[in-house]
Amino acid sequence: MNNIRKNHPLMKIMNSSFIDLPAPSNISSWWNFGSLLGACLALQIITGLFLAMHYTADTTTAFSSVAHICRDVNYGWIIRYLHANGASMFFLCLFIHIGRGLYYGSFTLTETWNIGIILLFTVMATAFMGYVLPWGQMSFWGATVITNLLSAIPYIGTNLVEWIWGGFSVDKATLTRFFAFHFILPFIIVALVLMHLLFLHETGSNNPLGTSSDSDKIPFHPYYTIKDLLGLLLLIILMMTLVLFSPDLLGDPDNYTPANPLNTPPHIKPEWYFLFAYAILRSIPNKLGGVLALIFSILILAIIPILHTAKQRSMLFRPLSQCLFWTLVADLLILTWIGGQPVEYPFIAIGQAASILYFTLILILMPMVSLIENKMLKW
């Protein structure tokens, strides 16, 4: 058996990635989220495939085909809600995974980090297009509002929007192409995930201390396979609690009304995992400025390795940086709350303050505090 595992062309790739992989001996539960993201992706592809068997990408039948899946298909309701809430779990794990990377300085593995940012953008695009497919009110108006942002691009904006729509408004052509992209993108995500792992295994994983673990490695199996299974079990418990007890908790009631181009919902808002970026977008009165702030709010992750001024890699022994990190987390939670509120006083002012704080923390305060900590440690 050992010979097959280590010598077979396919098996030895699996062996070197998941079985005999040398892993740091001290990585904590914050390192579980990579495998949980893999599990979420697998779940999304499987449930998505079964949904695609019954879904019709046509404006006249899309809404009723989703209702048909929930009412008439065997276990269709659970497949649909696993897929919808699976996206929420995916983003929850994704945000924690990125947060862990920021806290423990994993961004110094630049290739892995940059592919991770590309993955984040791809997953966000996939989730946005998936939200359009049920063709409810929020699907239609969400698609209209978000695609319309591209019209802020000078000179080519309007043409670009109409090109994406496939006409002069969000209609049948838009729905069909969104379904096509929503179907193909997860497989592109799988390819990017393999690249992400490839670059990670070139350098080896980081650890909570931020030091080299070359002198103290343990095999991935059985230690971390068992540890990942525990994380997976907890995720399944959380997921099934959500799906079986309150599947619509994170959804929008407006999406149970069929899309109507003549009736605008009072508050157009995306799913909860986009609200922080949506709040940043809305906090700038200028359209182009808002779009740039929206893009930069995520693209800012790419310059974090440049902004890293600390002599220590991890924040584990840097209490001042820890304070700023948790302030950033709180700020993102405030932005998420603001993104779901109507555009009126005092929410506009809170959103603007939180947006300014977000960029100030990352671009100015964190690098400054890192330099102060270097001085305090006489480094």
UniProtKB/Swiss-Prot annotation:
A ubiquinone binds at residue 201. It is found in: Mitochondrion inner membrane. Pfam families: Cytochrom_B_C (PF00032), Cytochrome_B (PF00033). Heme b b562 binds at residues 83, 182. Keywords: Electron transport, Heme, Iron, Membrane, Metal-binding, Mitochondrion, Mitochondrion inner membrane, Respiratory chain, Transmembrane, Transmembrane helix, Transport, Ubiquinone. GO terms for biological process: mitochondrial electron transport, ubiquinol to cytochrome c. GO terms for cellular component: mitochondrial inner membrane; respiratory chain complex III. One of its GO terms (molecular function) is metal ion binding. InterPro entries: Cyt_b/b6_C, Cyt_b/b6_C_sf, Cyt_b/b6_N, Cytb/b6-like_sf, Cytochrome_b, Cytochrome_b_C_euk/bac, Cytochrome_b_N_euk/bac, Di-haem_cyt_TM. The keyword Metal-binding applies. Heme b b566 binds at residues 97, 196. Belongs to the cytochrome b family. Heme 1 (or BL or b562) is low-potential and absorbs at about 562 nm, and heme 2 (or BH or b566) is high-potential and absorbs at about 566 nm. Component of the ubiquinol-cytochrome c reductase complex (complex III or cytochrome b-c1 complex) that is part of the mitochondrial respiratory chain. The b-c1 complex mediates electron transfer from ubiquinol to cytochrome c. Contributes to the generation of a proton gradient across the mitochondrial membrane that is then used for ATP synthesis. This is Cytochrome b. It comes from Eulemur mongoz.
